[in-house]
């Protein structure tokens, strides 16, 4: 045990590996231990901690056998080197020569120059090789080879590389437009609810608007009149209010579109006198262009008389459109003519009155802002229409 680096005697074995005489092990067979590796063990009388805990590692050829590992001797064997590569010994072999084309593709050898020229006599085949307006003769001049043998042999041209910048920009633009449109749509959908809240608040001055009807959660609880459930009696009135609000928004958009088209000159209208179908009489002049050939942005309204020339009225298109609407409305609603003196008086007011009006607007501005704030999401749409139409 001189070379055993294990622990001291854990189970009480004697130095010569004989069991304790208390168990009568040495009476009949004093040499019962046939371990050939017996040696003097000075530390046999010491009790220590075994390799697997206190008193669990017998020395030498005990419970673990006679192997070198059981006796605490560890043998380190050198690593076996990998076998030498056969490729390095024999070297790289050359690539075998490809067999000739007549052996691998015999069908290609049947398509020679004679057959090719005969096939070119067919107009359908000729159209594949000659563009429109090209040579109509039956002979084909060979195209000189400009590619070098090295480049044609080793350079394989596949699909062209994709331009990721153009692809990303092509996707980014519609994505931003979709995101902006979705944002504006969510804001526009809040307009009817905001106007509905303002409308219902007029009936509850000084208090919170509450609908005394029933809802699906509780038959007696109150709720906002702008969020009535279908079983509530106020649900039909809420739908009616929002329908009127939608019509008002559509009318507002239509008026803006008509004013924009008229400002761009795409809606040439002429002011009509009440009850007449002819243009108004005023400081007119004879144009040198015909009526169908009017410019895109006319500066006056034109009619086409019998001589082929147009008589222009020097009125800006927007004023002409406003006058046309006023004439159309005054013919059908005669009481609007009573407002003409008031409008003329209001237009001739002194600067003091205008300052008073400005002060009133400044005083009532916050409340007007609360009323007009739902229409703010419509401003970007109007601006885009104004810029691109």
UniProtKB/Swiss-Prot annotation:
Subcellular location: Virion membrane
Post-translational modification comment from the UniProt entry: Isoform M is N-terminally acetylated by host at a ratio of 90%, and N-glycosylated by host at the pre-S2 region.
One CC-aspect GO term: virion membrane
Major place of residence: virion
Glycosylation, residue list: 309
Residue intervals on the Virion surface side: 2-170, 264-337, 388-389
Positions of region (Disordered): 78-105
InterPro entries per UniProt: HBV_HBSAG
Region (Pre-S2): 109-163
Highest taxon listed in the record's lineage: Viruses
Matching Pfam families: vMSA
Keywords: Acetylation, Caveolin-mediated endocytosis of virus by host, Fusion of virus membrane with host endosomal membrane, Fusion of virus membrane with host membrane, Glycoprotein, Host-virus interaction, Lipoprotein, Membrane, Myristate, Transmembrane, Transmembrane helix, Viral attachment to host cell, Viral envelope protein, Viral penetration into host cytoplasm, Virion, Virus endocytosis by host, Virus entry into host cell
Chain spans, region Pre-S1: 2-108
Chain segments carrying region Pre-S: 2-163
A Gene Ontology biological process term: virion attachment to host cell
Segments passing through the bilayer: 171-191, 243-263, 338-358, 365-387
Record family assignment: Belongs to the orthohepadnavirus major surface antigen family.
Its job: The large envelope protein exists in two topological conformations, one which is termed 'external' or Le-HBsAg and the other 'internal' or Li-HBsAg. In its external conformation the protein attaches the virus to cell receptors and thereby initiating infection. This interaction determines the species specificity and liver tropism. This attachment induces virion internalization predominantly through caveolin-mediated endocytosis. The large envelope protein also assures fusion between virion membrane and endosomal membrane.
Domain comment, as recorded: The large envelope protein is synthesized with the pre-S region at the cytosolic side of the endoplasmic reticulum and, hence will be within the virion after budding. Therefore the pre-S region is not N-glycosylated. Later a post-translational translocation of N-terminal pre-S and TM1 domains occur in about 50% of proteins at the virion surface. These molecules change their topology by an unknown mechanism, resulting in exposure of pre-S region at virion surface.
HAMAP family: HBV_HBSAG (MF_04075)
Name of the featured protein: Large envelope protein
Species assigned in the record: Orangutan hepatitis B virus (isolate Somad)
Name of the gene: S
